[in-house]
């Protein structure tokens, strides 16, 4: 895939100003600036015009209904995987209450603090990935001490316009003017970015739970609260 990314440059030129804007990100990811600009949607013609950046399809939920998966094309998936391994994997995680999308942890680790508790409360976050918008993703990258311009470029590479038609069961990418970009469920970068974007929520719920004598943990969009006191205030 890397060879394809370099090869399809094919002599097409990118303006000097725009190329300079992507030079730093190109150095970090070791991918041509021209390719990064194209995958950000800044130049959409030729190869990219006929090949969508994401393939979207519905996936049935266990509890009924569907969730829409937005799977990136091979070139974009390659870039996103590079972002994941070079920028997201080394980043610290607020690990006291989060076990999803983390190496060596599973749903079992999420459930352990609540086993045998007298009171257990479960709830789901609605639209976990789509609710993490472009500006929230920018903020995540800025929180990693990445400057504004690079954060914007990285947010462009890891978000897309999402639109789902609940009646027809179809989903598609929106036009830029029709909504705000958000995390696509299906991109390799989305799980960690969603976890990082939820950090403030986790810390607030963790603090509130401790004050009330509860344990709190989150596994992706599943929130669980528990207390050993059968008379605990809910």
Where are these regions (language model features)?
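Reverse-transcriptase-like RNA-dependent polymerase core
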Residues: 40-62, 153-173
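Active-site substrate-recognition loop segments, prototypically the cytochrome P450 B′-helix/B-C loop
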Residues: 48, 52-93
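Conserved polymerase palm-domain catalytic core
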Residues: 113-220, 224-234
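Active-site-proximal segment of RNA-dependent polymerases
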Residues: 77-129
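A short, surface-exposed helix-loop junction/capping segment
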Residues: 2-9, 60-65, 178-186
């Amino acid at each position: 895939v890397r060879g394809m990314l370099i090869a399809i440059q094919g002599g097409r030129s990118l303006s000097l100003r725009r190329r300079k804007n992507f030079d730093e990100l190109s150095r970090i990811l070791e991918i041509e600036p021209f390719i990064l600009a194209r995958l950000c949607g800044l130049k959409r013609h030729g190869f990219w015009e006929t090949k969508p950046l994401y393939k979207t399809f519905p996936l049935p939920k266990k509890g009924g209904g569907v969730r829409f998966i937005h799977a990136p094309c091979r070139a974009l998936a390659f870039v996103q995987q590079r972002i994941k391994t070079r920028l997201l994997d080394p980043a610290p995680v607020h690990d006291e209450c989060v076990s999803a999308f983390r190496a060596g942890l599973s749903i079992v680790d999420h459930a352990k603090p609540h086993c045998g508790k007298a009171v257990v409360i479960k709830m789901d976050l609605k639209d976990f990935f789509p609710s993490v918008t472009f500006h929230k993703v920018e903020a995540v990258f800025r929180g990693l001490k990445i400057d504004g311009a690079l954060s914007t470029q990285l947010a462009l590479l890891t978000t897309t316009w999402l639109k789902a038609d609940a009646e027809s069961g179809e989903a598609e990418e929106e036009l830029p003017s029709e909504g705000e970009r958000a995390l696509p469920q299906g991109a390799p970068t989305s799980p960690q970015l969603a976890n990082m974007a939820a950090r403030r929520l986790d810390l607030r719920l963790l603090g509130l739970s401790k004050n009330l004598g509860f344990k709190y943990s989150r596994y992706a969009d599943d929130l669980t609260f528990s207390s050993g006191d059968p008379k605990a205030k809910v």
